[in-house]
């Protein structure tokens, strides 16, 4: 998509892991919570206030930004001390795009858990919870994002090194609604159309 291409240019991914982050960040939950812009700033060298060593360790590979469902589960378990069964219930709410009101019963447990473990202040716990609710609109799990990243990488490789074959295969096997767009792309690439 246009938004994925734009974000990839801003992030300049040089690994499948970073490309997976790009795929996961172009989701409504991440974008609505401002996580995408924050990720770009941090990837480009902006420093940030560290929340807690456990939290930062979980978010280390994503520059302190919560990107994946697995990170959400780890924070819920390791920062608030809630069991993985509870974290998994929250993950299911995230995965199924349920109404954020379904998060309400878990908010108090999370904040109390953070205070009891002395991992996050009440204010920080509430801020995290707000970010978590934004994730409820839709986010990927890491394996799903990685799968899309690998497919995207392969497609980009074939398009770059074998543009005729790429366009031809997509015209034959691709979506009917994309054919006009593919013909324009073929012209842009200087390919001869018969």
Where are these regions (language model features)?
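Noncatalytic, beta-rich nucleic-acid-contacting surfaces in large DNA/RNA-processing enzymes
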Residues: 2-194
